[in-house]
Amino acid sequence: GVYDAAKTARGEQPGAYKRHDYVVGEHATGAPPEDVAQEMQELLEEVQSVAPQHVFTAAAYLHAKLENIHPFADGNGRTGRLLMNYFLLCNNHPPLIVHEQSRTEYYAALAQFDTHLQLGELKTYLKKQLLETWAQEIFCSVKNGMGQ
């Protein structure tokens, strides 16, 4: 399945905040379990009333901060990308795809936020993905005769 069975065995449940700390590579990942609910509440309050001219920045921040908090035992990346796109759509902006072939650049941009709390690299990356997503969509539409 899409949820890590070993984490289920430790009492973790899909859709629930994590109950344990996790290590990815050499580093502990995210907020301690006892801080997750408060940090998520603060994040949602921060982005709730963003001005229209700052929606893309807020979407990038929402995604980066969710990954930084790492609220779930598994599926944080998928959830963060989905939430970012939902936020964009709710604010009349198009969604985007984080393409597999550029994942190294994506992870580096997220690491830049984790290390320095800077969104510049992530915003640049996401803008490129937005353009690539919709260039491919337009190309496919024209190729299939929908552009007539």
Regions found by a protein language model. Give the residues of each.
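FIC/Doc superfamily catalytic core
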Residues: G1-D74, R78-Q148
